[in-house]
């Protein structure tokens, strides 16, 4: 078992910011097209976060041209360049799947005050 834990520790990323469900994040992903490499930003609300060692994931949702788009990111993936936390959201749930059914202003999340 120690070998598995050692491999997992080598692949972990420790430069990720702290964010929770309800936070608006901007995820910069490396896209490789042929020999070229570029960064693509995906800005949206974190609706779910699954913790774990190397298999930790988080789901980000945004509405693009009236269509809801969700993307699941592996937190320790080398294809993620960096993550910016744009704003903190005030929510009472760990999973915000109910946002899928809401439209317009009802789908907004209040910003957390400090």
Swiss-Prot record:
Gene symbol of the encoding locus: rplS
Stated family: Belongs to the bacterial ribosomal protein bL19 family.
Source organism: Desulfatibacillum aliphaticivorans
Entry keyword annotation includes Repeat: no
Signal sequence segment: none
Record NCBIfam families: rplS_bact
Cellular component terms per the entry's GO annotation: cytosolic large ribosomal subunit
Name of the featured protein: Large ribosomal subunit protein bL19
Function: This protein is located at the 30S-50S ribosomal subunit interface and may play a role in the structure and function of the aminoacyl-tRNA binding site.
GO molecular function term, any single one: structural constituent of ribosome
Membrane spanning stretches: none
Entry annotated with the keyword Ribonucleoprotein: yes
Keyword tags: Ribonucleoprotein, Ribosomal protein
Gene Ontology terms: biological process: translation
Domain of life: Bacteria
């Amino acid at each position: 078992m120690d070998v598995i834990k050692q491999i997992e520790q080598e692949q972990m990323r420790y430069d990720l910011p702290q964010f929770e469900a309800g936070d608006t994040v901007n995820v910069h992903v490396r896209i490789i097209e042929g020999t070229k490499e570029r960064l693509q930003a995906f800005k949206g609300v974190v609706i779910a976060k699954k913790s774990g060692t190397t298999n930790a994931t988080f789901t980000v949702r945004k509405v693009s041209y009236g269509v809801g788009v969700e993307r699941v990111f592996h937190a320790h993936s080398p294809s993620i360049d960096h993550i910016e936390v744009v704003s903190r959201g005030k929510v009472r749930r760990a999973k915000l799947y109910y946002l899928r059914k809401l439209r317009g202003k009802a789908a907004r999340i209040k910003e957390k005050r400090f």
